[in-house]
Amino acid sequence: MEKKVTVRDVAREAGVSVATVSYIMNNRTDMKISEETRKKVLQIANLLNYRPSQAAKSLATGRNSMIGLAYRLNPNTPSRNLDLINFSNLLIERLNRLKLDVLFLPVSDTLVINRNIDGIIAIDLSHKDFAMLSNNCFVPIISVDMLINDSLFYQIYSDIPVLIERAHEHLGNDFAVVLEPYENEAYLEYITQNIPGENIILTSSFAETVSKIKGRKVLIIGTCLALMLRSYISDSDMAVISCSEYEPPLPESVYVYQNDIAKKANLTINILLNALDRKFEVKHDHKIAPL
């Protein structure tokens, strides 16, 4: 059986201390190490096929390189569920590129927290669910598409009301906004704050939604929801707010407004990384302008 290469083997071959190898392999920038030494250690580590264990990394950096991802899927909101999953995939892809693992945290009344988590990204949780999460997790929590309004937490959310205002250019002044309910009550209220009550159509049953949109001009939030309803309304009487990068395409005859999902994902991760490094920003409210 081939002997496993250790940090001591790399240090011996490179002619440096074990601590120096550890600093270099864990990208420690607070230690003064010459570029020549850094390159030499990395080359030898590569030649020996040395990979530090997760436990060793944790001891060296004080981190476990594990990020929790918390959201709740609702069987009554299939289009919104797809948006959540697509946005989560965007985050996971970027976090993995940074050598960070992601653990899904199912939000339930029997929430069990993995103590190896360094930080959490929570997406569209109700006030009750977020309170349960934050009361049990004492790590940085970044809330996305939620209005928490608590200086302990950062909140990042899409400025959907701006897109609703833009829709007047295409649909005129009298149109209904069709959307599935969001989990976060305050964010849903923020989205619909400037819409007359009779023009808000929150989907409950499909048949009821179809009956409400017939003969009306509508702005639909979510591409999947738009595709489900498209058979019951002409393309000229509808516009769509896209909430994902990975949605199925709509025909060119349908007017589509785009949220800047990539910017939201990048900002979420940047703020999380700063929080993990204890670089806390003064600004805790980040509204993402659309494309």
PLM regions and their residue ranges:
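Alpha-helical recognition/docking segments in bacterial nutrient-uptake
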Residues: 72-165
